[in-house]
Amino acid sequence: RRHLRIKVLHCFYAYFQDEEKDIARADMQLKSSLDKMFEMYIWLLSLVVEMQDHAIAKIEAGRNKKLPSPEDLHPNTKFVTNSFIRLLANSKILNNKSEELSVNWSQERELSKKIFKELITTEDYKEYMESPERGFSHDKEFLLRFFKRHMINVELLHDFFEEKSVLWTDDLDLAAGMAIKTIKTISEDDADLTLLPLTLYIVCAISSSPVRLIF
């Protein structure tokens, strides 16, 4: 909620700087801003799955070479079998929301491939792949660290979001915070992930009562 409080305070500031004090317009701007931030949050979660898809494609391409190397024939499949990412990939909630918001990395395949190539050169990725440790907790800890240290800091990703919406220029930290919180709350026993209920906060945030705006 702290991230959304910040967003609401920004809108408060803009409202009180507006000579016309048009509360309907302020409400509309706030809702639009929160909606776009939620969409960005879905893009980030979906990117995790997209990275695994690229890893799978890389392995398949190696196996289909005319003269595959021993590494091509016997690849390290630790990342492609990461159980935590598989939960995200199989999430009906995430897939449905992605479809609803037209979040589709397959339409940005070349960009996501470049991001993938950059990420697999990181030391955290290499250490994870070389570690003999396995299991959901290990997979989750890696992803959390990998996401915070690397995925959200890729310049190509920043450029992509900036081109998608000028509203996203300052919102990456907020959306990333939401994604990180979501990752932290998922457990091995969960049948599906739980997205942060941003729509509930929007209802509170756009209320015309100033008291209700502090939540």
Go through the PLM ranges and name each one:
Residues 1-215:
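Class I Rossmann-like S-adenosyl-L-methionine
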